[in-house]
From Swiss-Prot:
It catalyses: 2 glutathione + H2O2 = glutathione disulfide + 2 H2O. Belongs to the glutathione peroxidase family. SUPFAM superfamilies: Thioredoxin-like. Residues 1-21 form the signal peptide. Gene3D superfamilies: Glutaredoxin. GO terms for molecular function: glutathione peroxidase activity. The gene is GPX5. This is Epididymal secretory glutathione peroxidase. It comes from Sus scrofa (Pig). Proximal caput epididymis. The active site is at C71. It comes from the Eukaryota.
Amino acid sequence: MTVQLGAFYLFPLFMAGFVQTNSNLEKMDCYKDVTGTIYDYDAFTLNGNEHIQFKQYAGKHVLFVNVATYCGLTAQYPELNTLQEELKPFGLVVLGFPCNQFGKQEPGENSEILLGLKYVRPGGGYVPNFQLFEKGDVNGEKEQKVFTFLKHSCPHPSELIGSIGYISWEPIRVHDIRWNFEKFLVGPDGVPVMRWVHETPISTVKSDILAYLKQFKTE
């Protein structure tokens, strides 16, 4: 009973830390003195058939997104399709990385993820038009190395981390991803540019990217 009551009272803290970020910034510019690039990293595609070296994206603006099928933010999936389609002429590439660390909202095997997206959430025959990679961790001891690099390159926009009782990974770091659908933009030189919290509207992300592209062209 004591444990149940403790969990009950901690739950609002968890939600405040992981979902409610309105009191903080929606995005943050990355550090200016980043060492290394995403070209030092790689990943396997969702079906495991292709090993992609991220150096193949040299010259592109790349948006990294940690995704989940059964999340309240899964509605961002179709919006990411639109973002990819509209900004592809400007050199934008969207990359999705399924992760089950936040509310266990990506429970399926790699082979089940596309079916879940197509028939359950967002459903309606949805198919992502951007590359998805194998499911993996984005925080903790077993986090994918490219996310170690991205997180260390960019401060988190939110000062809230959440209730320790609901964090399933170790070690916990201040730059850790807080929830599904956080985003990192990487420039054409492979260096991270900016980072958004999960609940930032895709329309805002698009506006921020367009502003960055305009500034990038004038430099």
